[in-house]
């Protein structure tokens, strides 16, 4: 499908879907002792899983059941939400292929742990959050032992390599979508699904954005949070600043990192670069200082959109992957914000190989300065955030998780409760 056709398909899906997700009814679970297994593989997923865990406890009580026993894969945040964690895949998260290959024995062990838990603890439902590379194989194991699977934060198969959905729909009983056009796509591929809204809106409700960024002067660089991302993106971003400095010599620039894990790497790339400050652990504060941003394509774009910050989006593509992406990519934009808006609100640049940083720098100047382009972006960001729905995604997701227990077939329940013991 050509670009115009892809744009039209997304816009049609947005028009056909209700703006606000619905709160489902609770099943009658009076007196039922439930065991629920949650899994998250990265820090961002753990935040959403922890919020979901708390809502599951509240929803079970509201449905007449005692507090459920929560088991799972995750870290300290998930434990603080009441989950007994059996391992922490987030501590092993990696993006480069060499690192992932080295971790294969660890991930194989996770699959074995899940299988053992399905046999010994007989969970009523398995709830993986995001991270399909790990969770689709896990879902297959849960299905093998008759445990229904509700996947919260569905994979973006609609963006590239959509054929992967064939395996997905075989191992997932219910997919919980977070973007307003996703449900129509999963409907077309016969995947049972429900739109619950974006979980980041729950966090936004807890910390409303400060007044708009028009009276600020800082440019924020968001190169990603992993080693490979930083090494690929940060030097290119710094080079793009040359065009900004030519127009605004004294503009303050900040690089934001959520943790100090890669502080030495960032400082090594910075070298003697002047006028750039590294900030660690204060994303919210940095967003509150920013007038404009240059960011990698990823979940952080939802945060800049929440703050109304005009942003240039960078997506680096190696020459080796260029041809493959052309054949697999099925969306007109890389950024989720643009996809939700149904148009290119944030200017996007897919840079192949070394590329030329000048166009990015020039675009950054245009959105930094007052003018029609900046105003148009800010209007589009408001529209995109409205389409994500309001807060309550975790509450809606928890009700869907409990609701699937009502529809469990006698055959599956027998398979779950009589799973092999060895």
What is each PLM-predicted segment?
Residues 1-422:
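Nucleotide-activated sugar donor-binding and catalytic core shared by glycosyltransferases
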């Amino acid at each position: 499908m050509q670009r115009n056709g892809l744009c039209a398909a997304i816009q049609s899906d947005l028009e056909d879907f209700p703006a606000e997700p619905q709160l489902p009814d609770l099943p009658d679970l009076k007196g039922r002792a439930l065991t629920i297994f949650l899994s998250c593989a990265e820090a961002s997923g753990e935040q959403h899983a922890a919020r979901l865990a708390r809502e599951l406890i509240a929803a079970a009580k509201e449905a007449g059941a005692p507090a459920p026993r929560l088991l799972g894969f995750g870290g300290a945040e998930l434990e603080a939400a009441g989950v007994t964690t059996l391992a922490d895949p987030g501590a092993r998260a990696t993006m480069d292929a060499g690192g992932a290959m080295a971790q294969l024995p660890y991930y194989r062990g996770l699959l074995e742990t899940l299988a053992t838990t399905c046999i010994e603890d007989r969970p009523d439902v398995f709830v993986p959050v995001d991270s399909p590379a790990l969770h689709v194989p896990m879902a297959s194991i849960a299905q093998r032992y008759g445990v229904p699977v509700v996947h919260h934060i569905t994979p973006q198969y609609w963006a590239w390599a959509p054929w992967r959905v064939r395996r997905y729909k075989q191992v997932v009983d219910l997919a919980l979508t977070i973007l307003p056009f996703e449900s129509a796509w999963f409907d077309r591929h016969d995947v049972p699904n429900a739109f619950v809204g974006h979980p980041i809106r729950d966090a936004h409700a807890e910390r409303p954005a400060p007044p708009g960024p028009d009276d600020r002067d800082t440019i924020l660089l968001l190169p990603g949070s992993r080693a490979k991302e930083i090494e690929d993106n940060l030097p290119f971003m710094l080079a793009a600043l040359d065009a900004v400095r030519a127009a605004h010599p004294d503009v303050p620039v900040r690089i934001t990192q959520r943790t100090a894990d890669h502080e030495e790497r960032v400082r090594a790339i910075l070298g003697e670069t002047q006028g750039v400050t590294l900030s660690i652990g204060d994303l919210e504060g940095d967003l509150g200082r920013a007038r404009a941003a240059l960011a990698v394509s990823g979940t952080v774009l939802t945060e800049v959109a929440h703050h109304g910050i005009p942003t240039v989006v960078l997506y680096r593509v190696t020459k080796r992957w260029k041809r493959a992406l052309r054949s697999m990519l099925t969306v007109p934009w890389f950024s989720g914000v643009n996809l939700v808006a149904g148009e290119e609100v944030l200017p996007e640049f897919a840079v192949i190989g070394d590329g030329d940083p000048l166009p990015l720098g020039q675009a950054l100047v245009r959105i930094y300065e007052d003018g029609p382009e900046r105003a148009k972006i800010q209007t589009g960001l408001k529209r995109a955030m409205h389409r994500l729905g309001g807060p309550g995604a975790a509450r809606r997701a928890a009700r869907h998780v409990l609701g699937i227990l009502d529809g469990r077939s006698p055959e599956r329940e027998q398979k779950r409760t009589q799973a092999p013991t060895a």
